[in-house]
């Protein structure tokens, strides 16, 4: 009967590797060398590309932030993608160039970006910077992204911050802490190890030649994650530049926040299932260190799912040990849980003390229940892109 427990024993080994990757990244982040971004050399000419679907309510501040940072010869291009509102008119009145795309059969950010890039073929800018339509862009971010991208001739990912809206429930603060782990500590750890980072979706800069090497026309839920892996496979793995910061807030309503989390995490799981094994095989065959590092990083499931799977597998393997299936997998599970708790405590000490208080700890139970529902629906989910409603009344 011990064969019944073999899948859970193998799962424990895989989860141990995932937790080890997470632990190493978080520990390495504590040893990151502080230094200014590379800003020497001539400032290249850039085009800032904003894909926008029904974003008339939030795009004006974004355009204002970017226009104040543009230099001579730079361009700001908004792709009004399948819009049913006045996004195009608002963007044009705010000083951006605007092109319209209407194709109901091909919906999603990747298709919008591909349309925008093809419209730039005659211009051929040295650097293309992508900013989402609802993001604020910190002073100097465009200049820093442009110079670092030009100096390294690699795709660059800036610091992508998401914060809880004012007056939000405690579960938003827990979500913000998880975001800080994923998009701050972990890429800092990879940077400290001399490794690339994942693309996150906004605050990204690309040498024009890098984008020409991959097909970005996609409606997949996490096209940014997939694009980073494809670039790494082509020898153009992205680098992290925390000095260039963009920021936004989580959706205010519970339904919108749940929709956004579901979209991100279903997409991550889909990439994990569909792409990672072939990419890891390619990385080993090509001896591509950057692709292997990003594949291992992407193989780490969302933190809550990682914890739930590890706990369940350990309990089942504990039962197996009592029934004579051997104790090795159970002991490995206990060690993995210990390592995961240590990693989360280190992360909380570095990035969560201002967010997770006693009241936050009490809210973890309901938050886990919400996340469990997200994962339960993952395998039946629509993999097509769906825009998140940002606030009350927004479509």
Show which residues each predicted segment covers.
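N-terminal membrane-anchoring/stem segments of glycan-assembly enzymes
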Residues: 1-42, 344-346, 371
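Membrane-embedded multi-pass helical conduit in multi-pass membrane proteins
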Residues: 27-31, 38-40, 297-381
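Cell-envelope/extracellular polymer assembly enzymes that use nucleotide-activated donors
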Residues: 45-47, 75, 226
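Acidic helix N-cap motif at the loop->helix transition within catalytic regions
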Residues: 60-61, 85-93, 100, 140
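Short, acidic, metal-binding catalytic loop of nucleotide-sugar glycosyltransferases
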Residues: 64-73
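A conserved acidic beta->alpha catalytic loop
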Residues: 72, 80-88, 103-105, 135-136
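Long helical/loop segments within the catalytic core of UDP-sugar-dependent glycosyltransferases
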Residues: 100-102, 106-116, 120-125, 139-140, ...
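Short beta-strand-to-loop acidic/aromatic patch adjacent to the donor-nucleotide binding site
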Residues: 124-136
């Amino acid at each position: 009967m011990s064969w019944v427990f073999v899948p859970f024993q193998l799962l424990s080994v895989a989860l141990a590797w995932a937790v080890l990757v997470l632990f190493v990244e978080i520990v390495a982040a504590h040893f990151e060398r502080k230094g200014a971004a590379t800003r020497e050399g001539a400032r290249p000419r850039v085009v800032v590309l904003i894909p926008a679907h029904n974003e008339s309510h939030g795009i004006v501040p974004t355009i204002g932030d970017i226009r104040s940072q543009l230099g001579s010869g730079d361009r700001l291009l908004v792709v009004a993608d399948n819009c049913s509102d006045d996004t195009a008119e608002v963007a044009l009145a705010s000083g951006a160039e605007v092109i319209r795309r209407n194709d109901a059969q091909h919906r999603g950010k990747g298709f919008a970006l591909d349309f925008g890039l093809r419209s730039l073929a005659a211009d051929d800018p040295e650097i293309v910077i992508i900013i989402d339509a609802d993001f604020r862009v910190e002073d100097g971010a465009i200049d820093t992204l442009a110079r670092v991208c030009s100096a390294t001739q690699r795709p660059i990912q800036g610091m992508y911050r998401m914060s809880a809206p004012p007056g939000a429930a405690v579960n938003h603060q827990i979500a913000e802490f998880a975001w800080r782990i994923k998009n701050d500590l972990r890429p800092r750890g990879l940077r400290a190890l001399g490794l690339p980072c994942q693309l996150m979706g906004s605050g990204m800069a690309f040498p024009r030649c890098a984008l020409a090497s991959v097909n970005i026309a996609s409606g997949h839920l996490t096209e940014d994650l997939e694009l980073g892996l494809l670039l790494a496979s082509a020898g153009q793995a992205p680098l992290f530049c925390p000095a260039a910061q963009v920021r936004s807030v989580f959706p205010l309503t519970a339904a919108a926040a749940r929709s956004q989390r579901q979209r991100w995490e279903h997409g991550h799981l889909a990439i994990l299932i569909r792409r990672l094994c072939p990419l890891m095989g390619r990385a080993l065959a090509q001896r591509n260190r950057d692709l292997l590092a990003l594949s291992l990083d992407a193989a780490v499931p969302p933190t809550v799912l990682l914890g739930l799977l590890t706990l369940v597998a350990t309990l089942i393997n504990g039962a197996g040990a009592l029934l004579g299936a051997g104790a090795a997998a159970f002991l490995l599970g206990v060690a993995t849980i210990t390592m995961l708790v240590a990693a989360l405590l280190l992360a909380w000490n570095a990035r969560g003390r201002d967010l997770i208080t006693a009241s936050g700890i009490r809210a973890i139970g309901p938050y886990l229940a919400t996340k469990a529902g997200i994962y339960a629906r993952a395998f039946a989910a629509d993999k097509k892109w769906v825009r998140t409603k940002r606030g009350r009344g927004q479509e």
